[in-house]
């Protein structure tokens, strides 16, 4: 019994650390690329992090408890993006900001996959193999058009500003909707073929 509990504890710790390394670097990388794209490609003044969000986030602000739990038990999940100041980030800027979340996850997938491929440490391999797999999962999940995922903000970026308030109100109900899909096992059934595809792509990169 103690062996089983130790194994569960180790897997839970590995999953939690993996979640941290796919979520926190993703958001900081997103902000870096966002500022870079504004200053280089759009020739616009770069926005500071505290100007993008209504409230300056801390590292734990990106952790979504439900997203963490689903990653641990169902092999897919999501992160929490603090509320954006839609008065400053809208239209073209919102599209870029949302798309860069997906791109950041793909970059982390490539980085973590390369690390796990080159390392000789079994623990480092497990950590970054799972990090690569979950980063690719995050990039795909983010494209779902469900608030507050990036896919919904990509659509929102094409809508007039008057719909932004509606979006914020709808986000809460959409979270309840996602919980319902998980409880009814609909979301896991939808994700199952995607998880198999993601595992195959990850294995192709690493092995």
Regions inferred by a protein language model and the residue ranges of each:
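Hydrophobic transmembrane alpha-helices and their immediate loop junctions
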Residues: 1-207
């Amino acid at each position: 019994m103690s062996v089983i509990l130790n194994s569960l504890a180790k897997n839970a710790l590995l999953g939690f650390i993996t979640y941290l390394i796919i979520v926190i670097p993703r958001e900081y990388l997103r902000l870096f690329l966002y500022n870079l794209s504004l200053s280089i490609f759009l020739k616009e003044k770069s926005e500071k992090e505290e100007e993008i969000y209504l409230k300056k986030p801390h590292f734990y602000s990106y952790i979504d408890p439900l997203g963490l739990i689903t990653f641990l038990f169902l092999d897919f999940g999501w992160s929490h993006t603090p509320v954006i100041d839609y008065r400053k980030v809208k239209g073209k800027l919102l599209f870029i900001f949302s798309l860069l979340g997906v791109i950041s996850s793909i970059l982390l997938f490539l980085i973590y996959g390369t690390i796990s491929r080159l390392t000789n440490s079994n623990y480092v391999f497990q950590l970054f193999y799972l990090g690569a797999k979950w980063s690719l999962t995050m990039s795909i999940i983010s494209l779902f058009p469900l608030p507050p995922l990036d896919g919904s903000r990509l659509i929102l970026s094409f809508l007039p500003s008057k719909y932004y308030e509606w979006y914020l109100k709808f986000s809460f109900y959409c979270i309840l909707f996602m919980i319902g899909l998980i409880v009814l096992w609909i979301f896991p059934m939808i994700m199952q073929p995607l998880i198999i595809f993601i595992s195959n792509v990850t294995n192709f990169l690493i092995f």
